Amino acid sequence: MATIKDGEYTATIYKLIKDRKYVEAIHILNGQLQKHTKSRAALSLLGFCYFHIQDFSNAAECYEQLTQLHPEVEEYKLYYAQSLYKAGAYPEATKALFALDSPNLHIKMVKLQTCIKYCEEDYSAAKLLLEQLPPDDPDYMFNMGCLLYQDGKHEEACRSFLTALQVLGYLPALSYNIALSYYSLKNYPQALNYITEIIERGIREHPELSIGLKTEGIDVHSVGNTLVLHETALIEAFNLKAAIEYQLKNLKGAQEALTDMPPRSEEELDPVTLHNQALINIDMKPSEGFEKLAFLLQLPSFPRVTFGNLLLLYSKHEYFDLAADVLAENAHLTIKFLSPYVYEFLDALLTCQTAPEEAFRKFDEMSSRLTEQLRRLTKQLQEARLARDDDTQKKVLQEYDLLQDKYITVLMAQAKIYWNRENFQMVEKIFRKSVEFCNDDDTWKLNVAHVLFMQNKYKEAIGFYEPIVKKHYENVSFSGE
């Protein structure tokens, strides 16, 4: 009877693994294990193959059996803990690490413990563990960058990642983290530089991943969630590219970024991709988008912005009852996932449906606080200009733009209360009070124009409409009829 040690089987298995045909190798190895349940070679290769197709639960089962059959081999205990960690079984992974008793594996053990604590959002414990590593260890710089980023220190995180890049050379995950840091700093051109490098290397080095073929209309099969795909950081890079295009209001570019990524079946999609698909296509496929976002909320982990985006999109599409239900059913998520601004805004918006006067008062309080903050930033900007401090000017301007967006959002929601009552004089009054901070904003100008038009103040309305129309001349198409 043939065994895994037989030359024919060994050559076949190793060729399949070399060609990255892990699923076929798994099929043969499972057949061998049915005949020889304690075969060390079969279990070891099977664990390796499962790990590479990211079936970490089955990989963990293989390595668990190996730790029982060969307790003297400390590497199996490490592989078992790594597989549990990758499967999201963090307490079990920590327990498995305690079984390790090898000075040679101590550094790897500390690094894995650090990753576990980071994923458990125990950042202080992760930092303490990380400090056990030598400061010149490239992984120290990489992981310290992650902790700095998590702490909101994006510039410091970026510097840490760039230092690690100099030592380690090109790594897709490291380049992605640098791009993410630049994205958080609103430096989109630099972020796109690193994203482009990830994508171009992926196209050049992994033609089997069918990058961009779906966008071109070519029918392609799923490439699966292999470890190779994970190591290229392509999915993360395309999602970040989509986010940047979305922020730049280039919806077509955002959609293409999602279809350019290596193709996978619906059930293979990760939570971030599902979230971005829902968000970017919400106007064309609202029902599908809401379904995806609601589904994500049921998962043990989901993108942090999912909860807020679902509530805001329900409100945007005037599904206020659904928004209220989601908020009530997930009250425990509000503190963790909603900023005070978003929570207050949603509370006022939902109040509009039953008590518009009370809602107006809530919006007015928010508007007053934002006005104070905008004036403070205006003063800081003037001081930075006098001091010719370019870095401070840049930071303050970014903060001002974000705050102005929030202010205009509150202002429009407040004005809509009177717009719905056709009290256009009151709407105009609200807009006039906000001219100090909004007179350069096209959204504000357009709504001012609308309310003037509704009051038959056509000449004044044209004064607001005309600059906006001229700005968008290139988008106008003419008919020959």
What is the predicted function of each stretch?
Residues 5-35, 45-48, 52-55, 112, ...:
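Alpha-helical segment of the N-proximal tetratricopeptide repeat
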Residues 14, 48, 82, 115, ...:
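Residue-level recognition of tetratricopeptide repeat
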Residues 17, 51, 85, 118, ...:
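Position-specific recognition of the canonical hydrophobic site in helix A of tetratricopeptide repeat
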Residues 20, 54, 88, 121, ...:
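Residue-level detector of the short coil/turn that links helix A to helix B
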Residues 30-36, 64-71, 98-105, 130-137, ...:
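Solenoid-like repeat scaffolds
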Residues 42, 76, 109-110, 140, ...:
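TPR alpha-solenoid repeat register
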Residues 45, 79-80, 112, 143, ...:
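Canonical tetratricopeptide repeat
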